[in-house]
């Protein structure tokens, strides 16, 4: 891990909701000179989401100390074929079973398939399948305070790249102490490609759900012999991280 060279960074976050239900979220870690670009882009994104216009949109900007930021490489990327959800789910179980037991792999998949309107991720013990996040069940754990290195940032765009944004988030998640895997299915009803991460590899899998399905969420699997939930959650939610190698 390298420390970022001197710049003035800010963390920008957006959360949009209606009647208490999550609609959209986005965030980045950027040089302060680009803050207005991203604030405007995130506000537009919140108001053009496929789930409809939100009742409440919250934009937050926070200055980050340069000395606190670390830089890590992006995960390697691999794609697996699947023609329909049942085949995609078999691929997920097979990949997860390389790092946890088949029973825990099944539990993790079942958990993400039953997630609805989560603002964050569900944290599960990689040995027992027990849920470890201590918050409101609809909040979960928020992987936060991350972005790409300045030379790789193409700037904000209204038409977001699901792949690039997911790769950046997953790269931070897998750098957290004790995290051995992640499963994600987008909560965007029109986007059906999901991913699983294991052993420093981001594995894209199409057709993780039927088109316009309300399914959507993410699960992190934690090896509690390596790190406590408290330490891992602190890193995921608070440690500023820049990702390099995102094309």
Swiss-Prot record:
EC number(s) reported in the record: 6.2.1.14
Pathway: Metabolic intermediate metabolism; pimeloyl-CoA biosynthesis; pimeloyl-CoA from pimelate: step 1/1
Pfam families documented for this protein: BioW (PF03744)
GO molecular function: 6-carboxyhexanoate-CoA ligase activity; ATP binding; magnesium ion binding
Broad enzyme group: ligase
GO BP annotations listed: biotin biosynthetic process
Similarity comment: family membership: Belongs to the BioW family.
Task performed by this protein: Catalyzes the transformation of pimelate into pimeloyl-CoA with concomitant hydrolysis of ATP to AMP.
Protein name: 6-carboxyhexanoate--CoA ligase
UniProt source species: Corynebacterium diphtheriae (strain ATCC 700971 / NCTC 13129 / Biotype gravis)
């Amino acid at each position: 891990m390298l420390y970022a060279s001197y710049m003035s960074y800010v963390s920008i976050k957006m959360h949009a909701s209606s009647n208490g239900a999550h609609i959209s979220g986005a965030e980045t870690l950027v040089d302060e000179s680009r803050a207005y670009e991203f604030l405007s882009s995130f506000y537009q994104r919140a108001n053009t989401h496929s789930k409809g216009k939100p009742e409440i949109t919250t934009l937050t900007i926070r200055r980050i100390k340069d000395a606190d930021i670390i830089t890590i490489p992006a995960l390697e990327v691999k794609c697996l074929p699947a023609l329909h959800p049942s085949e995609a789910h078999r691929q997920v179980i097979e990949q997860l079973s390389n790092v946890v037991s088949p029973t825990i792999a099944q539990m993790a998949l079942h958990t993400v398939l039953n997630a609805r309107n989560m603002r964050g991720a569900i944290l599960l013990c990689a040995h027992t399948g027990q849920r470890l996040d201590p918050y409101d069940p609809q909040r979960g754990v928020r992987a936060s305070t991350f972005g790409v290195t300045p030379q790789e940032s193409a700037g904000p765009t209204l038409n977001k790249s699901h792949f690039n944004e997911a790769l950046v988030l997953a790269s931070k998640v897998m750098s957290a102490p004790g995290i051995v895997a992640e499963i994600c299915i987008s909560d965007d009803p029109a986007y059906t490609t999901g991913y699983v991460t294991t052993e420093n590899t981001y594995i894209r899998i199409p057709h993780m759900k039927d088109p316009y399905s309300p399914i959507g969420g993410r699960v992190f699997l934690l090896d509690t012999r390596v790190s406590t939930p408290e330490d891992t959650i602190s890193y995921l939610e608070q440690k500023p991280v820049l990702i390099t190698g995102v094309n």
